[in-house]
Amino acid sequence: YHNIFGPEGTWFGGREKAPAAICRKVAYAEDTDTIEVWGDGKQTRSFLFIDECIEATRRMMDSDFIGPVNIGSEEMVTINQLVDTAAKVAGKKIDKKHIDGPLGVRGRNSNNDLIRKELGWDYSMTLEEGIRRTYNWIMREIAKDVMEGEVVEPVGTI
C-alpha cells in the first residue's frame, strides 16, 4: 500500500499522513496565511484515496492471483503541489515557509503494472478530488470539536 489517505483517518497529533496534516493546517489557516513545510517541499510522493485502496484489496481477495502487488496511485506530486491542491480546494491562497525537518526519501511512487494486468484494477480518483473529500471531512470534524468544546490545536509541520 502506498500512502493511503482519506476521511476517518488520523488527522492530528503527529501520526497523520501528509494529506491529512496539510488539510488540517489549511483548514486552520486564514486566507493568505503561511504554513510550515519540511525541507524545500520538492520531495515527491503518490497518494491513494482510501476507497480506491478498498476496491483494489477487494479485487485481490476475490481473485485467484497469488503474489505481491502494489496498490497505490501513479500520480506523483511534490509536497508543495499537495499544499497548493489543499489550498485550492479550500478556496484560500496559502504561502509556504520551508523549514528544516525530516524529509524521508526524495521520491516514491507506485508501479501498478502487475495489479493492472492481473486484476484489471487501476485508480481513477484524482488527487484533487481525494483532497476535497478529506478536507471537507476534516472541516466537519473541526466544527464538531468546536461544538463539543474540544478544539484541536493546529500544531506541527509537514
Label for each model-derived stretch:
Residues 19, 23, 54-57:
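A general structural signal for well-ordered alpha-helical packing
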